[in-house]
């Protein structure tokens, strides 16, 4: 028995974008934030399958799960899907909100680099499909990260496998 993000990470490490990397952090962005660790090519889930879970770490006035999931869009009086459609139409306000979201993701990535120093971070989940709209804010935030060599050596990508969690669970 395992959690959905651990299954996603296992699937991505065996069949997707984390394949061939020794150390990876896989993050699902959706109604919440899930994360898992691939260390030395193997899923590391800890004693209770929660190793690497960073969504509940305090951030600003709430936690990372609030600011890096669909919950933050409720506070913006919109939804991720609405913003995705509007951004695709070139709506400046929607693009600005995605940029703001990207800044929060950049802070999350900074935390991941400090804690785990992975070779690759793979995003999955319903919000990952909008990476093209929030990656600018993410990378802009990472410009202030004190160890730029770590940022330069890190690959940040999204999963192209729709059923990575199923593949991971079946492995």
Regions found by a protein language model. Give the residues of each.
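Phosphate-binding/catalytic loop of phosphoryl-transfer enzymes
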Residues: 1-64, 168-171
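ATP-binding/phosphotransfer module of carbohydrate and carboxylate kinases, centering on a glycine-rich
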Residues: 14-21, 58-171
């Amino acid at each position: 028995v395992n959690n959905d993000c651990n299954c996603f990470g296992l699937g991505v490490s065996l069949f997707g974008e984390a394949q061939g990397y020794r150390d990876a952090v896989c993050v699902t962005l959706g109604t919440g934030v899930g994360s898992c660790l691939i260390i030395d090519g193997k899923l590391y889930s800890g004693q209770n399958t929660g190793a690497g879970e960073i969504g509940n770490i305090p951030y600003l006035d709430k936690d990372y799960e609030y600011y890096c999931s669909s919950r933050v869009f409720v506070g913006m009086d919109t939804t991720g899907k609405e913003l995705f459609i509007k951004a695709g139409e070139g709506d400046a306000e929607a693009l600005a909100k995605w940029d703001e979201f990207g800044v929060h993701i950049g802070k999350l990535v900074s935390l991941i680099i400090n804690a785990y120093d992975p070779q690759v971070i793979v995003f999955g989940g319903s919000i990952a499909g909008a990476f093209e709209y929030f990656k600018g804010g993410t990378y802009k935030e990472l410009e202030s990260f004190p160890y730029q060599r770590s940022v330069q050596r890190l690959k940040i990508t999204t999963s192209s496998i729709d059923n990575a969690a199923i593949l991971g669970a079946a492995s």
